[in-house]
Amino acid sequence: MKKIILFMSILAVANINAKSRSEMIREDLSKLGISQEIIVKTIELDKEIPNVVSEPDRGKIENMALEIEKVLKRNEKNFVLSENLINIYNAIGKNDTEKLNNLKRYEKYNPHEVSKLFFSNMYYSNKGDMESFDKNYEKLKEKYPDYLITRIAVTYVIGRDAIWNVMKNDEKTALATLNSIMKMCDDKIKTEESRISDEQAWAYKLTMGWFAISFYLNENRTQDAIDFYYENFEGKNKPSEEILYYNRYQNWYIKSELAKANKNDFYNNKKVFEKNLNKIKML
């Protein structure tokens, strides 16, 4: 099974209106008695975490880890930073002992079981501890079978290659499944119960969309890939600037892959070429 690094939102909200990641962090850490100074710094650091995997400068990532470690020492209840450190340690290859210490703090102070099960699952997957992974995974499916976060977990366990195989044999059914998950990502009640912020909901939506887009690109169906992206992530479905900033590297990667395919297939057809660039907002 492929190792998975996922950056998940882990914080609760009390009403049916979704909140931003920063609002969720402020609310949950305040309940733990963490100072406003530390909360503000946590929000600042957290905004850069989704882009760690795409950051080419290892020194920059290591400096970020040092800064997070310094803030975390001021209050170990800050489970947001414990989660962030695990993600950074995965990216730079820190040893398992340091990851486990942060996981223990994360599980101790994060009050939301659904997010703990999901994130711990990703930790065990990356570590290769499949016994612990299977235990958590079955518990997640049993206790939260209809939750968005469970649907996402199941999709990741299935994996890209298996999804591609289904699309080759029954594209309509595979797309219906991916579209149903993406629709849940737009449903504020569904994201609320899974403790997912607005920014992270769109990140998961992008990930589900990438399964289909990458399949189309692999099959040399560039126009289908571009149209799928436009219909789901641009136009009326384009999110706020705050959400785009949080997901800027993931979104830019997908756009870049589409732009390259568009150039290869349609550069000599200027009308189609430019129309497609406009669809993915690369003009």
Residue ranges of predicted features:
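Long, ordered, amphipathic alpha-helical scaffolds
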Residues: 196-201, 205-283
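Alpha-solenoid helical repeat scaffolds
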Residues: 80-84, 115-122, 149-159, 193-194, ...
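Post-signal peptide N-terminal segment of secreted/secretory-pathway proteins
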Residues: 65-114, 118
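Alpha-helical repeat scaffolds
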Residues: 60-71, 96-108, 130-144, 169-192, ...
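Residue at a conserved register position within TPR or TPR-like alpha-solenoid repeats
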Residues: 55, 89, 124, 158, ...
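Classical Sec-dependent N-terminal signal peptides that target proteins to the secretory pathway
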Residues: 1-20
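N-terminal leader/linker segments that initiate helical-solenoid repeat arrays
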Residues: 18-83, 91
